């Protein structure tokens, strides 16, 4: 009985994923990094003239505004950038 109870507790902790943190791609999409506390968005920055080639990727707290030369795409799920 104790083994069953202990198993249920362990499964519950694993399923809750305590301390969840966001993971965002770095510039090279194969590599990702865990975002620090407070950085709850992933972003991808690219030049408007070359929209298929990202210049920068990472974690950010607030999505920056686009300009005439630079565009930002932000999202909030793991490796969405």
UniProtKB/Swiss-Prot annotation:
Recorded GO cellular component terms are: extracellular region; membrane; other organism cell membrane
Disulfide pairings: 24-42, 35-59, 63-74, 75-80
Key words, A-Z: Cardiotoxin, Cytolysis, Disulfide bond, Membrane, Secreted, Signal, Target cell membrane, Target membrane, Toxin
Please list the tissues where expression of this protein has been recorded.
Expressed by the venom gland.
Q: Which family does it belong to?
A: Belongs to the three-finger toxin family. Short-chain subfamily. Type IA cytotoxin sub-subfamily.
One Gene Ontology term from the biological process aspect of the record: killing of cells of another organism
Q: What function does this protein fulfil?
A: Shows cytolytic activity on many different cells by forming pore in lipid membranes. In vivo, increases heart rate or kills the animal by cardiac arrest. In addition, it binds to heparin with high affinity, interacts with Kv channel-interacting protein 1 (KCNIP1) in a calcium-independent manner, and binds to integrin alpha-V/beta-3 (ITGAV/ITGB3) with moderate affinity.
Q: Which organism is it from?
A: Naja atra (Chinese cobra)
Q: What is this protein called?
A: Cytotoxin 3d
Pfam families per the UniProt record, alphabetical: Toxin_cobra-type
Recorded GO molecular functions are:
toxin activity
Stored SUPFAM superfamilies = Snake toxin-like
Indicate where this protein resides in the cell.
Answer: Secreted; Target cell membrane
The leader peptide range reads 1-21
| Domain of life of the source | Eukaryota
What does the subunit comment say?
Monomer in solution; Homodimer and oligomer in the presence of negatively charged lipids forming a pore with a size ranging between 20 and 30 Angstroms.
